[in-house]
C-alpha cells in the first residue's frame, strides 16, 4: 500500500484548509494510506496568539525522521517574500541526516501554497521549494493542465501547473475558493495515483 503524507505549515488557516482538501483528493485513490500532519510552530505561543496565528490546528506535528516512511510527500506553505515560510524551512533544514542516507531518493515530492495577493509569489514559492526536493532526489509532481480549474478565466483564482495555490487577500480575509479547493483535491489525487503506481 502506498503511503502519502500531506505536510504543511499554516499561520492563519488558509494552507490548513488547502491541506485538508489535498488529503481528501489523495484519500479518493484506492490502496493509498494518507496522513495529514503539520510542521512545528517556531513562534512562541503567546506571541503567535497576539498576532492572530491559528495555534489550535487539529493535525498532529510531524517529526523529521518519519518522512522516510512515505512514498510521496505533498508539502504546503504560505509565501514569505516568494519563498517558503520560515517554519517549513527550519523543518527541512533538519533533514540533513535523511539526505546523507538518501532516504528520500525516488520518492514523490509535490508542493501547494498560499499568497496574500494575486501576484504575491505563489509560483516562485513552489519552484524555489522544488530546489530542496531535488537535492533530496525526489521526483517532482505538479498539477497537469488536464485539471480544468487551471484554465478558469471566470474569476480571480489561484492554481498553477507547479501546484495548487490560494489567494488569501492582503488582510487574510479571503478564504480558498471552490475552484482552488478543486485544484487542491486534484493535486492530492494525482500524486496518490502516481505513488500507487510506483509502489506497485
From Swiss-Prot:
Q: Which GO terms describe its molecular function?
A: flavin adenine dinucleotide binding; FMN binding; NAD binding; NADH:ubiquinone reductase (non-electrogenic) activity; NADP binding; NADPH dehydrogenase (quinone) activity
| Residues that hold FMN according to the record | 10-15, 79-81, 114-120, 135
- One Pfam family here: FMN_red
Which positions in this protein are listed as binding NAD(+)?
12
Q: How is the cofactor bound?
A: Binds 1 FMN per monomer.
Which residues hold substrate?
99
Under the heading InterPro entries, the entry gives: Flavodoxin/NO_synth, Flavoprotein-like_sf, Flavoprotein_WrbA-like, FMN_Rdtase-like_dom, NQO
Its catalytic activity? Answer: a quinone + NADH + H(+) = a quinol + NAD(+); a quinone + NADPH + H(+) = a quinol + NADP(+)
EC annotation from Swiss-Prot or TrEMBL: 1.6.5.2
Keywords associated with the record: Flavoprotein, FMN, NAD, NADP, Nucleotide-binding, Oxidoreductase
The cofactors it requires, by name, are: FMN
Q: Which Gene3D superfamilies match?
A: 3.40.50.360
Any idea where the Flavodoxin-like domain is?
4-191
| GO CC, alphabetical | membrane
Which NCBIfam families does its entry note? flav_wrbA, PRK03767.1
What family does this chain come from, according to its entry? Belongs to the WrbA family.
- Could you tell me which PANTHER family the record lists for this protein? FLAVODOXIN-RELATED PROTEIN WRBA-RELATED, FLAVOPROTEIN-LIKE PROTEIN YCP4-RELATED
This chain's protein is named NAD(P)H dehydrogenase (quinone)
Recorded source organism is: Burkholderia vietnamiensis (strain G4 / LMG 22486) (Burkholderia cepacia (strain R1808))
